[in-house]
Amino acid sequence: TYVHLPMIMGKNEDGSVSKLSKRHGSTGFSDLVNDGYLPEAIINYIALLGWCPKDNQEVFTLQGLAEHFSIDGISKSQSIFDYDKLTWLNGEYLRAMTLEQFTQLAMPSYKQVFPQTDLNWEVLSSILQPRVTKLNQIADMIGFFKELPEYSAELFVNKKSKTNLENSVTMLEAAIPVLERLDTWTVEAIH
């Protein structure tokens, strides 16, 4: 007697489903790791593709998966590989890490953007960790520190905040002395 998980399908652009293949995106484990997903998150997600835990828990450690897995929860119907769900799950793993663990994983991206610089990496990590869902996003998220992107003046126009190009200048000028009086430049002090 043997048991296997149901077939994994991929969602096509037209909304239909077909057998998971490369046209749906990265399908191999190493490809997913290269795309910024953590091995633990990939394993967790794949386990959930054809199996439903009794308590509907979604985030597991590897040990937790081994303890909770039961063939009673295996579904007979096909599963659809959802990259958005995998990305969400990966973000949960990243946020659950200690700041030190996240910093260590982010270091290759930090060094890619700042190759000759030694910064307080944990401060940068404390800002990024709540926002990052895949490791390969980090270099793009911090690239503006090295080279400022072009910003459109429309950035200062917001109907909800009632800002326009004229009153935005006044608001920014009023913010300068307030920021200059800050003793410490921390997120808490600035907000």
Features from the language model and the residues they span:
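Small-residue-rich helix-loop
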Residues: 99-191
